Amino acid sequence: MRSRNQGGESSSNGHVSCPKSSIISSDGGKGPSEDAKKNKANRKEEDVMASGTIKRHLKPSGESEKKTKKSVELSKEDLIQLLSIMEGELQAREDVIHMLRTEKTKPEVLEAHYGSAEPEKVLRVLHRDAILAQEKSIGEDVYEKPISELDRLEEKQKETYRRMLEQLLLAEKCHRRTVYELENEKHKHTDYMNKSDDFTNLLEQERERLKKLLEQEKAYQARKEKENAKRLNKLRDELVKLKSFALMLVDERQMHIEQLGLQSQKVQDLTQKLREEEEKLKAVTYKSKEDRQKLLKLEVDFEHKASRFSQEHEEMNAKLANQESHNRQLRLKLVGLSQRIEELEETNKSLQKAEEELQELREKIAKGECGNSSLMAEVESLRKRVLEMEGKDEEITKTEAQCRELKKKLQEEEHHSKELRLEVEKLQKRMSELEKLEEAFSRSKSECTQLHLNLEKEKNLTKDLLNELEVVKSRVKELECSESRLEKAELSLKDDLTKLKSFTVMLVDERKNMMEKIKQEERKVDGLNKNFKVEQGKVMDVTEKLIEESKKLLKLKSEMEEKEYSLTKERDELMGKLRSEEERSCELSCSVDLLKKRLDGIEEVEREINRGRSCKGSEFTCPEDNKIRELTLEIERLKKRLQQLEVVEGDLMKTEDEYDQLEQKFRTEQDKANFLSQQLEEIKHQMAKHKAIEKGEAVSQEAELRHRFRLEEAKSRDLQAEVQALKEKIHELMNKEDQLSQLQVDYSVLQQRFMEEETKNKNMGREVLNLTKELELSKRYSRALRPSGNGRRMVDVPVASTGVQTEAVCGDAAEEETPAVFIRKSFQEENHIMSNLRQVGLKKPMERSSVLDRYPPAANELTMRKSWIPWMRKRENGPSTPQEKGPRPNQGAGHPGELVLAPKQGQPLHIRVTPDHENSTATLEITSPTSEEFFSSTTVIPTLGNQKPRITIIPSPNVMSQKPKSADPTLGPERAMSPVTITTISREKSPEGGRSAFADRPASPIQIMTVSTSAAPTEIAVSPESQEVPMGRTILKVTPEKQTVPAPVRKYNSNANIITTEDNKIHIHLGSQFKRSPGPAAEGVSPVITVRPVNVTAEKEVSTGTVLRSPRNHLSSRPGASKVTSTITITPVTTSSTRGTQSVSGQDGSSQRPTPTRIPMSKGMKAGKPVVAASGAGNLTKFQPRAETQSMKIELKKSAASSTASLGGGKG
């Protein structure tokens, strides 16, 4: 009942304090918290419940009331309520402070923070809330970021404005420049058109002469066809022989294949048997291993389980006994507790009755029925009983809980005991099973022993089978080797057959050369092998000698070491005795000094210790209160003492070091004194000897000493000689070791060289195969060119490539000796040129040159390299960048591609020439039957003075000497020429040297035609040897009348001057006002028209000057002269692909159709170009505009002209 009384008191106190709290809350202006309200409600309920008797009981005593007022003890709830009220007041005060602060805030601050200052109150409230929430963005200004962004925008605007102004200025400049250039180009265009008319007149006159040349060429071709027919017959006979040989080889191969098949079947049968045996063995071994593992596992498991079950059985028995005793005790407790519970239930019933009576009494008191003091006494007594009963109730509840827990424990123990019994039964069953397993284990052991014996037998069998397998494998390897050999033989035979079918006599010669080279290489390899074996034998001999010498040296070393050791021992013993005696004396003196110093130090230490002890004795006599202070003082003194001792130790260390130094000095002084004393003794001894000698007493002793001295000197000399000899031997051995190491290095180097030679031989073989393949490819291309049965040649080998000459051509170069090497190089050069041209095409066009550069004076025109046509360049959307690859004779720059004339297949073209002598022009109209393919060409030819244009042809000699770097040559015969001089230059290959298989055949010459329009100096003359003309090219050049000496031939001038414009006219532009890029040009070079093929290597937007490589470097003429005539025939030709090459054999000189090259076509080359392509022999010129499906060719055929003079092409 104590808890209830306390609650009643607290409620009464709370009732008194309630009005105060309400007043405080009204003064503070803020109500209490929700917790305080809840507490109030609880208190009111308790006040209502409290009885009036208690209040009456408290009223009469006035003194007690005064005491309670003095010492008011507030409860926890009241204190919490007061605290909450105080917190509310503080919050209200803080709110008021914030309100006042926000009222003082200026509108400028609000505007900076929120961007506007119109609703001031609302913004202030927001500002206040932000301060309360402690936001981070209170001090931030809204206008900072936009202002900074505005500044950035202004700066960017200024920069963009400046850039735009610059671009506009640049655009204006470019516009002015383009306008100026366009005007200049218009003037030039008119000039070019006037000049092209004159050229057409020249072409008409040239046509008649070319017809005569064609007739001569036909006669030459007939002669050639007869020769080709004879050679074809010979080749067919050889083919028949080779076919018979191939059939024999095929029969042999079939025999070998049958033998191989039989042997392979045998091998397969044996391998199958072996596999079966191996599989059986593997299965048996696997089973035996598994059985062993199982047995071992079972043994281990059985042992573990037996031990574990025995331990578990013992533990379970012990647990059962403990559980049974524990259960008995719990049952006894249960019985006692059940009795107690019954008693408590009875008391509980009585208590419930008392409570009911109490409630009735309380009701009566509340109603005011009973107001007697006796009833009050009864109530008090009843209350006491109720309190006692409540205490008993608590005890009863505790006992009930204990009983429940005990019941639960009992149930758990019973359940656990049941489980233990079940486990014991399981263990017993398991024991019986394990006994059975033991029996099975013993049986399996016996089976294992039997299996082991079987395994050993099987192993023996497998060993025998393996031996048989190895024998079979060796046989199989031998068979495989024979197979591979046969396959190699087969492949080689196939290759030979294809080669013999496709290759001509030239390839046979090449193969012979290659075989000779291979034999030479094999001989070299054999020689190297022999040298290697000889070197190996020498190395072995040297190693044996070195080993013997090293053994001897070791013996000598050991003997010398023993001698030296004995001598040094004797000397060391004598020296040691002397030193030991001296050291003893020094040590004794030092030890005496040290002992003295140590004694002094020990005495000082003892004195200090005695002093410390006396101080300590006096301190112990002090009273107890001052002991702590004295101890601290002692500690401080001891610390100081320790420091002093450390300093003393340092001093002692220093003194020791000084002592050691003094000791060393003393020893040195003592040594000096001993040495001096010895010298004194020797001097005394000598003085005594001298005196004795003077007296004649000690002569015999001096003689003996001298004799001994001489003997010792002789011994020392012998020893020195021996030492020297040993040193020399050691040096020799070292040298030999170095030689050995060098020999090993040389041996390794030789091995490497040998390996390299082997690899080289392999590479040579591969190269031979590659070359044969390349020649096959070239033959395939030539097969596409040759007609089948019209009497012409069967095989046309292209001997002139279209590659750029990138290095000087050496006359005696080994690589140029064979046509295979030449063909390979030509393909490489083609690829190289195309890659260069692609790079140039990708480059940006360079800026135009100034007016002075474009229009140089007439004096400088002779040194210009290329003609420049700006209006044409503009049509092709960009100028070509002049390439200068160095000061070479074949240097030139390129020009964009021109349009291609593409007549329909099988339809002839008609050329109509209309000359105009008044305007010095001629119009060339090239038409096909339909109106779509109509083209016209207007040629303007300038006449110097009042001379009329005419065409003259100079027959030139056909002997050419090809030099890589020649000066600008001139034509041999000097004569007065017409305004336009067309010069045909003929040459053929020299039959000398025996390099070609067709050297005995007459070869068609190569003709070069030069056309130039400007005057050249008459002083230019160069020897025939210094002239260079590329094989397989025709060069067109126009020269005026005043040129007394023929102008030098310029190869592949940069810009082709035959252009087709939008009005379907071909304009061939000539003249001296063409712009040329400044380059390395020789004196006397006149402006040149160069017409070159589209589909050869210079197949891009840049046409580079090219020098062609030919299989033979030297060219000589054939005796015999004939007339030179030439005609132009234009016929449409269908091409097999979009690109084509014109390649004709230098030996045969027959015409051939264009064939596709391996050079890829760039997109910029889709526009066609007029093409002049000389064949390999140089007797065929084709004007071939390229189209997608067909091409038109203008063939310029010339006959051979023989003369002994040589003529070369000039630098282009």
UniProtKB/Swiss-Prot annotation:
Ranges of Low complexity composition bias in the record: 1124-1138
Basic and acidic residues bias: start-end ranges: 32-47, 60-73
Bias kind Polar residues: ranges: 1-15, 1139-1155
Functional note: By acting through a filamin-A/F-actin axis, it controls the start of neocortical cell migration from the ventricular zone. May be able to induce the degradation of Filamin A.
Name the record gives this protein: Filamin-A-interacting protein 1
Keywords of this entry: Coiled coil, Cytoplasm, Cytoskeleton, Phosphoprotein
Subcellular location, principal: cytoplasm
Organism: Rattus norvegicus
GO CC field: actin cytoskeleton; cytoplasm; glutamatergic synapse; postsynapse; postsynaptic actin cytoskeleton; stress fiber
Residues carrying Phosphoserine: 137, 978
